[in-house]
Amino acid sequence: IDPGHPVYPHVEGFQSIVLLKNDESSRPDTNDWHKDLTFKSNPPFASILHGVSVPKIGGDTLWASMSAVYDSLTDGWKEDLEGLEAIHDMGTFRNDFYKEGGINSVNSALKKVGSAVHKVIEKHPISGKKYLNVNQSFTRNILNVSQGASDHILQFLFQLLARPEFQVRFHWQNNSVAIWDNRITQHYAVNDYLPNSRHMQRVTIINDKRVK
């Protein structure tokens, strides 16, 4: 189990259980497409999310299949993306550190939390399916291409996730639990429930014991 999150609070006495509690005083910030913690060199392979107390209407979570997104690409795009790598960092979590202590706090956090390099196209170690491995929240730029080319490529890839054909949507009830493969999916928490509150707890699992 991942030992904790660099920004989000945890359940008292349980460092590895992340507390995601949002309302008007603590507005949600997960309403964009992302994979959990890809700024780490070894991101979690799975996430488990528990709906402790959820709104009756709204607050759904969407998941997108990144293998389906990859399969939708033309052969030309697949060839061009194969072998490329991208830098992932903590993204807008910078805002939290800036509020705490200005730019010095941001710089310290960047050094402490670190960045990671991941392949743009990965192969799932169990299914063998290829999947797209970039996300809006944490993928900063593609290595060894110009900034303009990197921006163009990433924006093209990000907008593909908007297609409903690649998505599934889950409506939470109190004590619902969702488990997903963090490698081959991305998710989006819909921010449509304020002023109601949404109380979730999450753990992330680092190692897949099926992978030798």
Functional labels for PLM-detected ranges:
Residues I1-V177, N182-K212:
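Non-heme Fe(II) oxygenase catalytic core, chiefly the N-lobe of the double-stranded beta-helix
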